[in-house]
């Protein structure tokens, strides 16, 4: 079952990315390194509700 999630930057707390994940394969919250347009660098982004 795939669900849509929002990724939030851990430094500036801006929600910039929408993606989907499979809850069966990834039951925990996802953490990805993505580019943050506000900080102009690659930062850690965490899944939000």
Swiss-Prot record:
Any one GO biological process: translation
Alphabetized GO MF terms: structural constituent of ribosome
Keyword hit for Ribonucleoprotein: yes
Keywords: Ribonucleoprotein, Ribosomal protein
Pfam families xrefs: Ribosomal_L33 (PF00471)
InterPro entries to which the protein is assigned, alphabetical: Ribosomal_bL33, Ribosomal_bL33_CS, Ribosomal_bL33_sf, Ribosomal_zn-bd
PROSITE patterns with a match to the protein in the record: RIBOSOMAL_L33 (PS00582)
Single GO cellular component term: cytoplasm
NCBIfam families membership: PRK00504.1, PRK00595.1, rpmG_bact
Name the record gives this protein: Large ribosomal subunit protein bL33A
Organism: Ligilactobacillus salivarius (strain UCC118) (Lactobacillus salivarius)
């Amino acid at each position: 079952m795939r669900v849509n999630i929002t990724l939030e930057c851990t430094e500036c707390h801006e929600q910039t990315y929408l993606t989907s994940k499979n809850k069966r394969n990834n039951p925990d919250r996802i953490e990805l390194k993505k580019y943050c347009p506000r900080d102009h660098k690659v930062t850690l982004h965490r899944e939000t509700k």
